[in-house]
Amino acid sequence: MEQAFIPSISVFQPHQIVCLEHEMSCLYAEVVQVATKRQICWVRPLLLSETLVAPSESDRPIVYDLRQGADLLWPVSLFRPALDTEVIPLLVQLETADREPESFQIARQQFNCFIQQVWQAYKSEFQAS
């Protein structure tokens, strides 16, 4: 699914959950601060949700825990407000998931891959105006 670029009518507020969509993945993050003059959003990633192309028996997305990872400073235009109804089930899935020792490393790799794909797809959004 391609991200729709809609000029930000309302500025995001601190602690608001936002979503950055790209293809079959969604990054959910908490807003820390917005630099309105530069249209940059400082966010703290919470989770990355990936929907499989082939439906599985559970139809639940794969969820990666990003709460121990790095923050991002990215263009506001890439984000949209996240709905409670979409975030809460993912957070529940995240909390009930088995904690394997290598899960943080896998989550970090998936996050890095996602960030690189988004950057490649929307390079023009990162150009200084």
Sequence positions of predicted segments:
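Short, structured beta-strand/loop micro-motifs enriched in basic residues and often containing a Trp
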Residues: 1-3
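Short coil-to-beta transition motif at edge beta-strands of beta-rich domains
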Residues: 5-22
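Short beta-strand-centered aromatic/proline hotspots
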Residues: 26-36
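Short, solvent-exposed secondary-structure boundary/capping segments
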Residues: 38-46
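Intrinsically disordered, low-complexity, charged/polar segments
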Residues: 49-129
